[in-house]
Amino acid sequence: MNRNEILFDRAKAVIPGGVNSPVRAFGSVGGVPRFIKKAEGAYVWDENGTRYTDYVGSWGPAIVGHAHPEVIEAVREAALGGLSFGAPTEGEIAIAEEIAKIMPSVERLRLVSSGTEATMTAIRLARGFTGRDKIIKFEGCYHGHSDSLLVKAGSGLLTFGNPSSAGVPADFTKHTLVLEYNNIAQLEEAFAQSGNDIACVILEPFVGNMNLVRPSEAFVKALRELTEKHGAVLIYDEVMTGFRVALGGAQSLHGITPDLTTMGKVIGGGMPLAAFGGRKDIMECISPLGGVYQAGTLSGNPIAVAAGLKTLEIIRREGFYENLTARTEQLVQGFRTAADAAGIEFTADSVGGMFGLYFAAHAPRNYADMARSNIEGFKQFFHGMLDRGIAFGPSAYEAGFVSAAHTPELIDETVAVAVEVFKAMAA
């Protein structure tokens, strides 16, 4: 009896598509999603009791590993004091202070419950601050599911072949300019034509929602120069990359100081927590100090804050990122070697604890490159690995994640399985 099949059928009777986030449905890879019963360290177990080495990591938050004892204890202690108050707590001050120490660009910070809330409010704030309407985003970048940002977005939209979402009125998106990632000429043209009307530019500073796409140094430099020149707000959406690619996020690797930053995933330690922050003059436009409204009943939830504070403490320990980066590089290099030996066209890339796998000769620079990759090849690889106890995200457009719980020996075991799978694909 396959419990995953039984639960999927049961779920579809009460939940649209049987899942609460589209990519989980295995729609782009086929098959039955694994219903997870428990997780610990680098492993998850499904309802059949099958153990998998996990490279999804809850889509990024599980940077210290699942069910880390110190995080669990912090959550337990916080829960004993109450689950939610709808009032300020010392913990939310503490986590804001910690983030500000790590990210100097964050002079003021507001906690919310999801990455979508963070990006949605950052856009509203940029518009309120500048008095302008137009925004620039990039094709294939995903910034949550708020209406103005669901235009040629990444993540689940790409997974299901939908460039934009139904149900979003044209009036909501007419002010959204969509450009090609890493295309400086398009960026310059957009500012030349509409510079006085552009409120902000938002981007994933390493795109994790069309696999892993790196920005060129010239591209991020042009972004900063053009936004400063035209008085537009530069928003780094670090919901995925923040504290994942480096302690200080992508902005610390780029040497760029954005005006606003959105963050989530890692800062909640596996609990629902996100934030947006940045320049004091912009952030003080938010209510109750300014006229830009934002609120949330569960914002700064004490349980989520406790998990986040403990996670931030762990990742700041000596050698954490050096080890995380080394393990991730070990994984992608092993995959490249295995694919090459089997004669499979494949490459891989990584930054910090985040990686991308591409069934193509070269790593993509934009959405068009990623769309030309061998998606069918990824499907074969995904199922070959899953059948052998290794779990990746069920979409060719999603980045993968390594945690501190992934040991060198475990990485070697994963690579050995990949050798088998690549050989089988080449047969």
From Swiss-Prot:
One Pfam short name: Aminotran_3
Catalytically driven reaction(s): (S)-4-amino-5-oxopentanoate = 5-aminolevulinate
InterPro entries: 4pyrrol_synth_GluAld_NH2Trfase (IPR004639), Aminotrans_3 (IPR005814), Aminotrans_3_PPA_site (IPR049704), PyrdxlP-dep_Trfase (IPR015424), PyrdxlP-dep_Trfase_major (IPR015421), PyrdxlP-dep_Trfase_small (IPR015422)
Record carries keyword Cytoplasm: yes
Pathway: Porphyrin-containing compound metabolism; protoporphyrin-IX biosynthesis; 5-aminolevulinate from L-glutamyl-tRNA(Glu): step 2/2
Subcellular location: Cytoplasm
N6-(pyridoxal phosphate)lysine: modified positions: K265
Gene Ontology BP terms: protoporphyrinogen IX biosynthetic process
Gene Ontology molecular function: any one: glutamate-1-semialdehyde 2,1-aminomutase activity
Family (UniProt): Belongs to the class-III pyridoxal-phosphate-dependent aminotransferase family. HemL subfamily.
PANTHER family per record: GLUTAMATE-1-SEMIALDEHYDE 2,1-AMINOMUTASE, GLUTAMATE-1-SEMIALDEHYDE 2,1-AMINOMUTASE 1, CHLOROPLASTIC-RELATED
Protein known as: Glutamate-1-semialdehyde 2,1-aminomutase
